Swiss-Prot record:
GO biological process entries: glycine decarboxylation via glycine cleavage system
Keyword flag Cytoplasm: no
Subunit structure: The glycine cleavage system is composed of four proteins: P, T, L and H.
Membership in a protein family: Belongs to the GcvH family.
Name of the encoding gene: gcvH
Organism: Idiomarina loihiensis (strain ATCC BAA-735 / DSM 15497 / L2-TR)
InterPro entries xrefs: 2-oxoA_DH_lipoyl-BS (IPR003016), Biotin_lipoyl (IPR000089), GCV_H (IPR002930), GCV_H/Fam206 (IPR033753), GCV_H_sub (IPR017453), Single_hybrid_motif (IPR011053)
Organism lineage string: Bacteria, Pseudomonadati, Pseudomonadota, Gammaproteobacteria, Alteromonadales
Cofactor note (record): Binds 1 lipoyl cofactor covalently.
Protein name (Swiss-Prot/TrEMBL): Glycine cleavage system H protein
Role: The glycine cleavage system catalyzes the degradation of glycine. The H protein shuttles the methylamine group of glycine from the P protein to the T protein.
Keywords: Lipoyl
Residues modified to N6-lipoyllysine: 65
Cofactor: (R)-lipoate
Length: 129
């Protein structure tokens, strides 16, 4: 069973979102997603300053099994990326909710967070898969 922290919000496409309390939101992929993908070999991240809209494919996680698009869970501007993943993409596997974060978005409208799933709803959605 995958670890699904209750303090995060989730997209149906397996991204997680953490509200940093300052108008920015950290985004990564769920433990469930990284388990499905397998060992990461490369993570292509957006550029700082990129304007993104909810649902845009803005990053790619490449594993030994497949390449998978990563989608923007909120509309806004990318304000930070996890540059450590360039040299250590396996961090996404080892610590998906911590050091394996992907990027941060300054949201245009933080109420978009309400459109995402809570941990229980996300867990129910992956149990159906």
């Amino acid at each position: 069973m995958s670890n699904i922290p209750a303090d995060l919000k989730y997209a149906s496409t397996h991204e997680w979102v953490r509200d940093e309390g300052d108008g920015t939101f950290t985004v990564g992929i769920s433990e469930h997603a990284q388990e499905l993908l397998g060992d990461m070999v490369f993570v292509e991240l957006p550029d700082v300053g990129d304007k993104v809209a909810t649902g845009d494919d803005i990053a790619v996680a490449e594993s030994v099994k497949a390449a998978s698009d990563i989608y923007a869970p909120m509309t806004g501007e990318v304000v930070a990326i996890n540059e450590d993943l360039e040299d250590a993409p396996e961090t996404v596997n080892n610590d998906p909710y911590g050091d394996g974060w992907l990027f941060r978005i300054k949201a245009d409208d933080s109420s978009e967070l309400d459109n995402l799933l809570d941990a229980n709803t996300y867990e129910a959605s992956i149990d159906e898969d």
